[in-house]
């Protein structure tokens, strides 16, 4: 079957939502053929470069939200809890990031949103990091923020703000009830209004439909997220979705390919759950994605850095530093 999707996309002819759902669900369209189309687009915009990102879990487990995927949810009785870490620990993480060719360092806090004191703590730390590592991009992920807090983060040197949509608007209330889909969209838009690069992505494998998956990709196109992390559910015992099966590696590849075709110019990152869902097919994901998280995630482990570097080298790709 001749797809010709890449040429259409490169000619600025966007796929429609109905087309995308049909392509995604069509069993006659081979996953590797679809991936090759995505690779043509990825190569056009990013060549063989791979961006590296690293996470610091700066505050853990102190959260009143009931997100069904999260081991830090209010529903979880047993979880790792600690308040916002000292500035020196955050700075040490920045040093580690620089030493490991990481381009973006992500400072993440649990909870609905930060207090003004916590924002000041982060801002002071970021200002110090930028003096020593001016080339290191700083991404903050602090939850739902206020306008004045966003202005402070921008002034301190925060380059990017992550706030994932996580799922489709239709499926949102199955995932969390303590905040709305609109809350998430508004947070992303507020960061854009304050000239902070928006990072927003998804978690696939929470029981959503194929239509939901495609809706997510189009929603992210609509809000114009610069960076799109694609997480695959890593089920955690005790959470609402803890008993769900992992996605198949081939479905994961199909998802990543569709996100690339729908958001051709964006940084697309394979993120949490990639190791357990993609398994031995992880390297193939970089035919569509151009970015990965290196090291551990918030409360689940990643594979050793050396394996990620080897994967990139074996593909004939190179780190985008």
UniProtKB/Swiss-Prot annotation:
Highest taxon, organism lineage: Bacteria
Gene3D superfamilies: Aldolase class I
Enzyme category, top tier: transferase
Enzyme Commission number, as recorded: 2.8.1.6
Binding-site residues for [4Fe-4S] cluster, renumbered to this chain: 63, 67, 70
Family: Belongs to the radical SAM superfamily. Biotin synthase family.
Protein name in UniProt: Biotin synthase
Source organism of the structure: Staphylococcus epidermidis (strain ATCC 35984 / DSM 28319 / BCRC 17069 / CCUG 31568 / BM 3577 / RP62A)
């Amino acid at each position: 079957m001749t797809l010709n999707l890449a040429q259409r996309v490169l000619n600025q002819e966007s796929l429609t939502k109905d087309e995308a759902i049909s392509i995604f669900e069509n069993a006659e369209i081979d996953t590797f053929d679809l991936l090759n189309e995505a690779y043509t687009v990825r190569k056009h915009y990013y060549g063989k470069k791979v961006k590296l990102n690293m996470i610091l879990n700066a505050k853990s487990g102190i959260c009143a939200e009931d997100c069904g995927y999260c081991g830090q949810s209010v529903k979880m009785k047993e979880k790792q809890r600690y308040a916002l870490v000292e500035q020196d620990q955050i700075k040490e993480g920045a040093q580690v990031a620089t030493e490991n060719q990481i381009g973006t360092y992500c400072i993440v806090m649990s909870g609905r949103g930060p207090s003004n004191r916590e924002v000041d703590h982060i801002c002071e730390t970021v200002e110090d990091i930028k003096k020593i590592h001016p080339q290191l991009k700083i991404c903050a992920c602090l939850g739902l923020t206020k306008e004045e807090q966003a202005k402070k983060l921008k002034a301190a040197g925060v380059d990017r703000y992550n706030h994932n949509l996580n799922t489709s608007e239709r499926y949102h209330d199955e995932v969390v009830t303590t905040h709305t889909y609109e809350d998430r969209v508004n947070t992303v838009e507020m960061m854009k209004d304050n000239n902070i690069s928006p990072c927003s992505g998804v978690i696939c494998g929470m029981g959503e439909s194929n239509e939901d998956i495609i809706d997510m990709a189009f929603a992210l196109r609509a809000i114009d997220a610069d960076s799109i992390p694609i997480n695959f559910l890593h089920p955690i015992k005790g959470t609402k979705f803890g008993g769900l099966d992992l996605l198949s590696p081939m479905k994961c590849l199909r998802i990543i390919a569709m996100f690339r075709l729908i958001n051709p110019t964006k940084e697309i990152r394979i993120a949490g759950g990639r190791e357990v869902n993609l398994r031995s097919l992880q390297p193939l994901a970089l035919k569509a994605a151009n970015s990965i998280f290196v090291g551990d995630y918030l409360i689940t482990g990643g594979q050793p850095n050396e394996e990620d570097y080897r994967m990139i080298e074996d593909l004939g790709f190179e780190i985008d530093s």
